[in-house]
């Protein structure tokens, strides 16, 4: 018991301190400054290394158990130049000296460095700075507004941070926003560097829960991008996927496969790519992209001034229209496997305009007249009926509406 003083000098080796009751001091000898010390945590033990090697320094048993409960332990570090460091006055700069073990911070503001291996780091409470380093790290920020640092070559790190309100992901030198690509996989936001899926950051549960959407991307050139306030350009895989976007203005490239896309509330651009896709624009003024060979897509829309934009090689003359069960079916070049089905076209799901790559367009009123005229109008100069009985209405007829 009592306020004890422990003395450690260069060359003293690796000592273990088992504090009793009292507020204790660890006094370092000549030639040792505060900047010479490295701190590490393993379970509840605090390791203080002098220099970068692990064979010189002090281990304080149960330090963090006492620290977290504001109980007495070794509190002060004294140096020969007269400076004093209070170990309980703030957070720590912690390094990973123990491979294949996790790193935990404190309830104060810590700086935590991972190793070149794949680490698991838990910042606990406090606004921490977490540098995972190389390897595929798992990073938990805990409470507080945390900062995650990622540099080129750092691998693919996973971040879980539901408790912050203004956390940051800071990218290192020579990384700008345009270098990043975004993808939704299993409701996690993947941010890849230059499209390399082994390099970047994964924000877990980003699309599943708004609590996880609190990060701002910060770049070395001073620019930033707030993920909680802006839409994304999502570039998906070529497999069959079911995913959602944000409630902001998104651009979605689904790739190949039979995909199901839920765009949210923003003014979105949805490109289902190849395959038979389900596209749900939601609220907002949405644009659905359809290109030759794009399969047969089903569009579910709700509100807004919405459009279908057809790609190169598709004009109004290539389309045929069929209306039934309150839906509008648009077939391309008479191929029933190519086109779109607009669900609830006569209700909240209507599409207001069709756009073409040649610059022409047709409004919803004209499209509805086309549907109504299909069985009543068949002059050879204005329309033609293909071998399947579907009506393809020409530009000449549109001009006369």
Mark where each language-model region is.
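Acidic, glycine-rich calcium-binding repeat modules characteristic of RTX/beta-roll
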Residues: 1-45, 49, 53-73, 109-188, ...
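Low-complexity acidic/polar repeat-biased segments
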Residues: 49-101, 192-234, 331-401
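Leucine-rich, hydrophobic repeat-scaffold detector
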Residues: 103-108
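Extended carbohydrate-recognition surfaces in non-catalytic/accessory domains of CAZymes
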Residues: 237
């Amino acid at each position: 018991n009592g306020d004890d003083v422990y003395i450690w000098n260069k060359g003293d080796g690796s000592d273990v301190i088992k504090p009793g009751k009292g507020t204790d001091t660890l006094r370092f000898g000549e030639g040792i400054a505060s900047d010479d010390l490295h701190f590490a945590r393993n379970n509840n033990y605090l390791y203080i290394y002098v220099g970068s090697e692990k064979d010189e320094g002090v281990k304080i048993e149960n330090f963090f158990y006492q620290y977290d409960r504001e109980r007495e332990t070794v509190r002060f570090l004294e140096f020969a130049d007269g400076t004093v460091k209070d170990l309980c006055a703030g957070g720590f700069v912690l390094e990973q000296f123990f491979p294949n073990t996790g790193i935990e911070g404190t309830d104060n503001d810590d700086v935590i460095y991972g190793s070149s291996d794949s680490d698991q780091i838990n910042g606990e409470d406090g606004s921490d700075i977490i540098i995972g380093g190389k390897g595929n790290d798992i990073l938990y920020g805990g409470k507080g507004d945390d900062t995650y640092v990622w540099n080129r070559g750092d691998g693919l790190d996973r971040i879980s941070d539901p408790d912050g309100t203004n956390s940051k992901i800071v990218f290192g030198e020579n990384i700008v926003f345009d270098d990043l690509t975004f993808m939704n996989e299993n409701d996690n936001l993947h941010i890849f560097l230059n499209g390399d899926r082994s390099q970047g950051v994964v924000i877990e549960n980003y699309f599943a829960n708004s609590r996880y959407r609190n990060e701002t991307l910060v770049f070395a050139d001073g620019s930033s991008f707030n993920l909680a306030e802006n839409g994304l350009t999502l570039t998906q895989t070529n497999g069959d996927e079911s995913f959602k976007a944000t409630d902001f203005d998104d651009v979605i490239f689904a790739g190949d496969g039979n995909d199901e896309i839920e765009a949210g509330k923003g003014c979105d651009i949805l490109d289902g790519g190849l395959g038979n896709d389900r596209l749900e624009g939601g609220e907002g003024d949405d644009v659905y992209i359809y290109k030759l060979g794009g399969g047969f897509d089903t569009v579910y829309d709700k509100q807004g001034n919405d459009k279908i934009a057809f790609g190169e090689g598709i004009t109004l003359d290539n389309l045929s229209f069929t209306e039934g069960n309150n839906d509008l079916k648009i077939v391309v070049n008479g191929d029933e496997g190519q086109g779109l089905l607009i669900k609830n076209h006569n209700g909240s799901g209507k599409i207001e305009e069709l756009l073409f790559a040649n610059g022409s367009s047709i409004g919803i009123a004209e499209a509805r007249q086309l549907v109504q005229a299909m069985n009543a109008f068949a002059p050879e100069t204005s329309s033609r009926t293909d071998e399947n009985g579907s009506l393809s209405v020409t530009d000449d007829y549109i001009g006369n509406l």
